[in-house]
């Protein structure tokens, strides 16, 4: 047996360079590159290996471990999970910073390889710098926290353990049914230890993603159920995009006159203008999709996890005869809602169903309902696009909260812009193939409802974990995946303040991204939630502390985000009017460096709910009558929802 004497870290780098993916007959390198933030826990081990011979891995320098790992996830998401990035951090706080990103990747079923440095396997220098000492178990380190949020976790305590660990890591990273974050912990001493690795460990390895076919029995059962139903609706989930099954879903919809709603992950698989595309569905869905869904007697989920936002906490589907068919590569997700399970690749399942249903000449009984719902929503969309602040008689979309002090925001922020009008202008002015990236706050709701996707795969929303701070890093990841397209981070001031470190990395790499920063001086989405459930405005507006009351109810804070970003070298713009917005968007396209448009918008001017409900933990006992009323409303809505 031929062997190669290498350090553990050198062997890892060599192994990663030999991993390939094959999908529908096309092969490509699976691991494009690696994000790094070096510290004592990885610099002389994995860092040395990368310096000596990184192979074809592109080595990127992150600014924050969570930020770079979010960028890695976004890269894989935009690549439809066919190519990924790895990330390495030092021990302790560096690795802990990636835990949130691991959770984000796993919640979204997006493959990311995390390589955190770890404490010494020998324990000779214990406690090493940045080590936590647990008196009940000395084998525990910070990295054990990754166990709860990783789809596969391992620790390499001996060099030879690398081989079995990485084989299992690749199994999970390339498994569409159960992929997510894979964490391989690398004790800093073991990284530098040498071993005689067998040469076959470094052979080219091609991981073929097979398209799983539906079983005859599940296919027959699905056909039997569908043919009994008159008003079915489909839900287009992220699995449609990852399986590249958009054309088959279109064929299915057109052949049998079945409309479909989109989840956040599924949106832009098919252009918004398609006659059977109702748009976003659920809590952040629009009126067209939710109206049709309420009356549907069959829900066909395709590549969806059926989250509470998609099902409106399982209260959306009100037809007493409603049943579910779940097409999913994951048995776990297919098993939800007592559904008839079709555990298969989305494309193969749809093709098989098309053949069977065409043979019996099935058609839904819809006549004008679909077109009428879409037309009604288009009218509402035009209204949202044209909302302008009109002074004292102005009624914001979210009424009854700030009606008496909205003018305070007009004066403090120096703006009269409404959020829906800004989004309308952006949708008109951005290139058709531009990619928008979002994650948290009120923007995901506005975008799922309002954004018209004119080209496939241009809507990139992380809403599985809704991780604040994903947006800017996510834009960088999407840009690395599709460097020829303009990429826009749609981010609120709350999320931007949490994390925007990789904006600097975009400058360093000459990968232009555009940050569209909506500043309403607060956590506006959560303010809506608390006030909509009977509370006052508490801890969600960005106000100075009032010296008299000692509460955060002083003057509204105004932050010059443009000035801050300009210090990095970003091209910046300040916007308080529609005309300024139009000029800024046009000029930003001409730039070669990353841009930031600081857009001051009025609170409560985002979209509100459309025929949906969200189950949250309203207080059962309170001295507040409005909270009591909110609890009674919750109980009433819960009675209309499925129990599981």
From Swiss-Prot:
Region (Thiamine pyrophosphate binding): 442-522
Cofactor, free-text remark: Binds 1 Mg(2+) ion per subunit. Binds 1 thiamine pyrophosphate per subunit.
Residues holding thiamine diphosphate: 65
PANTHER family, sorted: 3D-(3,5_4)-TRIHYDROXYCYCLOHEXANE-1,2-DIONE HYDROLASE (PTHR18968:SF9), THIAMINE PYROPHOSPHATE ENZYMES (PTHR18968)
NCBIfam families referenced in this protein's UniProt entry, alphabetically: myo_inos_iolD
UniProt cofactor(s): Mg(2+); thiamine diphosphate
InterPro entries membership: DHS-like_NAD/FAD-binding_dom, Myo_inos_IolD, THcHDO_hydrolase_firmi, THDP-binding, Thiamin_PyroP_enz_cen_dom, Thiamin_PyroP_enz_TPP-bd_dom, TPP-bd_CS, TPP_enz
GO biological process, one term: inositol catabolic process
Coiled coil feature spans: none
Physiological role: Involved in the cleavage of the C1-C2 bond of 3D-(3,5/4)-trihydroxycyclohexane-1,2-dione (THcHDO) to yield 5-deoxy-glucuronate (5DG).
EC number(s) stated in the UniProt entry for this protein: 3.7.1.22
Enzyme class: hydrolase
Name assigned to this protein: 3D-(3,5/4)-trihydroxycyclohexane-1,2-dione hydrolase 2
UniProt source species: Bacillus cereus (strain ZK / E33L)
Entry binding sites for Mg(2+): 493, 520
A GO-annotated cellular component: acetolactate synthase complex
PROSITE patterns found in the cross-reference section: TPP_ENZYMES (PS00187)
């Amino acid at each position: 047996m031929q062997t190669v004497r290498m350090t553990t870290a050198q062997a890892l780098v060599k192994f990663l360079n030999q991993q390939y993916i094959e999908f529908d007959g096309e092969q490509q390198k699976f691991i494009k590159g690696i994000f790094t933030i070096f510290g004592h826990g990885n610099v002389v081990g994995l860092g040395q290996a990368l310096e000596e011979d990184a192979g074809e891995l592109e080595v990127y320098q992150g600014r924050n471990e969570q930020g770079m790992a979010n960028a890695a996830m976004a890269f894989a998401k935009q690549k439809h999970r066919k190519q990924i990035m790895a990330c390495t951090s030092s021990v302790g706080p560096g690795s802990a910073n990636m835990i949130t990103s691991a959770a984000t990747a796993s919640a979204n079923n997006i493959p990311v390889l995390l390589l955190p440095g770890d404490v010494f396997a020998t324990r000779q220098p214990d406690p090493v710098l940045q080590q936590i000492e647990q008196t009940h178990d000395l084998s525990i380190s910070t990295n054990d926290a990754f166990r709860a949020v990783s789809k596969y976790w391992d620790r390499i305590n001996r060099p030879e353990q690398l081989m079995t660990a990485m084989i299992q890591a690749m199994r999970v990273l390339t498994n569409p049914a159960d992929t997510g974050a894979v964490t391989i912990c690398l004790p800093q001493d073991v990284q530098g230890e040498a071993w005689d690795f067998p040469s076959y460990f470094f052979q080219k390895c091609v991981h073929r993603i097979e398209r799983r076919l539906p079983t005859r029995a599940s296919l027959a059962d699905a056909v039997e159920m569908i043919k009994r139903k008159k008003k079915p609706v489909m839900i287009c989930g992220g699995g449609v995009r990852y399986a590249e099954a958009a054309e088959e879903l279109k064929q299915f919809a057109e052949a049998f006159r079945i409309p479909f709603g989109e989840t956040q992950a599924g949106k832009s698989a098919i252009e918004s203008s398609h006659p059977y595309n109702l748009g976003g569905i659920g809590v952040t869905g629009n009126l067209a999709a939710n109206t049709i869904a309420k009356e549907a007697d069959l829900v066909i989920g395709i590549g969806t996890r059926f989250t509470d936002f998609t099902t409106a906490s399982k209260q959306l589907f009100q037809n007493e005869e409603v049943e579910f068919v779940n097409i999913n590569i994951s048995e776990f997700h297919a098993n939800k809602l007592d559904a008839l399970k079709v555990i298969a690749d989305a494309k193969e399942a749809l093709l098989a169903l098309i053949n069977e249903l065409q043979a019996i000449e099935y058609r839904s009984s819809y006549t004008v309902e679909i077109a009428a719902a879409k037309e009604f929503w288009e009218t509402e969309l035009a209204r949202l696009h044209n909302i302008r602040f009109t002074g004292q008689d102005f009624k914001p979309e979210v009424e009854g909260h700030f009606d008496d002090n909205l003018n305070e925001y007009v004066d403090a922020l120096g703006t009269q812009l409404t959020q829906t009008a800004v989004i309308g202008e952006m949708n008109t002015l951005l290139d058709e193939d531009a990619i928008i990236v979002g994650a948290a706050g009120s923007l995901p709701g506005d975008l799922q409802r309002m954004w018209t996707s004119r080209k496939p795969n241009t809507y990139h929303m992380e809403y599985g974990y809704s991780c604040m701070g994903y947006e800017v890093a996510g834009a960088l990841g999407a840009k690395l995946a599709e460097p020829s397209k303009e990429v826009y981070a749609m981010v609120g001031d709350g999320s931007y303040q949490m994390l925007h470190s990789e904006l600097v990395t975009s400058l360093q790499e000459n990968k232009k991204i555009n940050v569209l920063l909506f500043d309403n001086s607060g956590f506006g989405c959560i303010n809506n939630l608390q006030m909509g459930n009977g509370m006052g405005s508490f801890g969600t507006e960005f106000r100075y502390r009032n010296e008299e009351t000692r509460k955060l109810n002083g003057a509204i804070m105004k932050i010059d985000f443009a000035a801050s970003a300009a210090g990095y070298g970003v091209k910046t713009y300040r916007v308080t009017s529609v005309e300024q917005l139009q000029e800024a968007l046009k000029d930003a396209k001409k730039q070669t460096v990353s841009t930031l448009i600081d857009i001051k918008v009025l609170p409560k001017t985002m979209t509100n709910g459309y025929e949906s409900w969200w189950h949250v933990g309203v207080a059962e006992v309170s001295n507040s009558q409005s909270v009591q009323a909110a609890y009674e409303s919750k109980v009433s809505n819960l009675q209309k929802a499925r129990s599981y």
